[in-house]
Amino acid sequence: MQYYQWPDQGVGTVPAYTLQADKNTQIPSKTFDRPYVWSKMPVKVDKNSDTDIKDEVATLIYDCGIISKSQFGRKSTWAYYENALEGMIKYMKYNKGTHMQNRATRVMSEWHQMLRKELDAKRPILYTASTKSGGGHMFVIDGYTQKNYYHVNWGWSGSSNG
């Protein structure tokens, strides 16, 4: 989002929702009423960054969380991929043609071809992986090499990206 500085701002109102694990906690509704200030969102933010920079980045991260109906917790936050996809289209003005693909339904060469096509078109890929026991992680693939090695942004403040 920061690389493309998109969207200029969210649209509509995200309805309030209740956390699944804590029925006493309700995430309030949010109306998108101001543009994102992309010039105040550097690629990297740390504890020494100015407060206004931290606030802008925090706003974007929170907005991405609520449009995905994220389940916020003390140790982790999670969301269903389907909710994230729906929220990106409905509230962040992403193309309605944006869709989900399942790797299990394709042969590997076809899968790599599809990933490269998206990346060549300058469309980073929101990717999810999970274990049979239900654990998982959502991350971004934003580049590749000719040998089908992909660059992954794991979403851990730059830790272990590559």
Q: For each of these PLM feature ranges, what is it?
A:
Residues M1-K44:
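Active-site nucleophile-adjacent alpha helix/oxyanion-hole segment immediately C-terminal to the catalytic cysteine
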Residues M1-Y4, I53-L60, I66, S70-M88:
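Active-site nucleophilic cysteine motif
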Residues Y3-Q5, V37, T77, E110, ...:
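Residues in intrinsically disordered, low-complexity segments of regulatory proteins
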Residues D8-G10, D63, S160:
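Intrinsically disordered, low-complexity segments enriched in small/polar residues
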Residues P42, N48, S70-Q71:
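N-terminal leader/propeptide and maturation segments of large enzyme subunits in energy/redox metabolism
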Residues E86, K90-N153:
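Active-site-adjacent substructure of cysteine-protease-like catalytic cores
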Residues G155-G162:
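Conserved catalytic-core surface of thiol
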